[in-house]
Structure formats: C-alpha cells, structure tokens
Amino acid sequence: MGMRMMFTVFLLVVLTTTVVSFPSDSASDGRDDEAKDERSDMYELKRNGRCCHPACGKHFNCGR
C-alpha cells in the first residue's frame, strides 16, 4: 500500500467512527440523568459539611 492509500484508509476510518458515534450519543440520555443525580447528592453532602466523594473529600470530613 502506498502512502496515499494508507492516508485515505485512515481518513475513512476516522470519518466513519465520527459518523457512527453521533447517533449513539442520544442513547446515553438516561445515564446522564443518573450522573446528575449523583452530582446533586455530592453537593448536598458538601452543604452539610461532609463529603465522601473523592472530588470534595479533601476539603470536607467524610463523616463515616
């Protein structure tokens, strides 16, 4: 295979991957809602002065 052919195949793979990934984004909407709930729980714990999540645990006591 020549360099042009390899570059063309590379572009086709990249474009195909990009086009295929767009429709699958809408399928993750249900999982996004669950993640938002977990984040809101984390912020509620931060307001109470305790948080066991790694993102806020270094600033607050875990309370366990």
Swiss-Prot record:
Tell me where it mainly resides: secreted
Which keywords appear in this protein's UniProt record, sorted alphabetically?
Amidation, Disulfide bond, Hydroxylation, Secreted, Signal, Toxin
Tell me the leader sequence span. Answer: 1-21
Name a GO molecular-function annotation: acetylcholine receptor inhibitor activity
Q: Where in the cell is it found?
A: Secreted
- What is known about the tissue distribution of this protein? Expressed by the venom duct.
- Modification type 4-hydroxyproline: residues: P54
Tell whether Signal is among the UniProt keywords.
Answer: yes
Q: Name the cystine pairs.
A: C51-C56, C52-C62
Q: Which residues carry this modification: Cysteine amide?
A: C62
Q: Which InterPro entries match?
A: Conotoxin_a-typ
Q: Please list the residues that make up the propeptide.
A: 22-49
Q: Give a yes or no for keyword Disulfide bond in this entry.
A: yes
Task: List, alphabetically, the GO terms of the cellular component aspect.
Answer: extracellular region
Q: What else is known?
A: Found in injectable (milked) (IV) venom.
The record's comment about this protein's domains reads: The cysteine framework is I (CC-C-C). Alpha3/5 pattern.
Q: Which protein family is it in?
A: Belongs to the conotoxin A superfamily.
* The protein's name: Alpha-conotoxin CnID
Q: What is the lineage of its organism?
A: Eukaryota, Metazoa, Spiralia, Lophotrochozoa, Mollusca
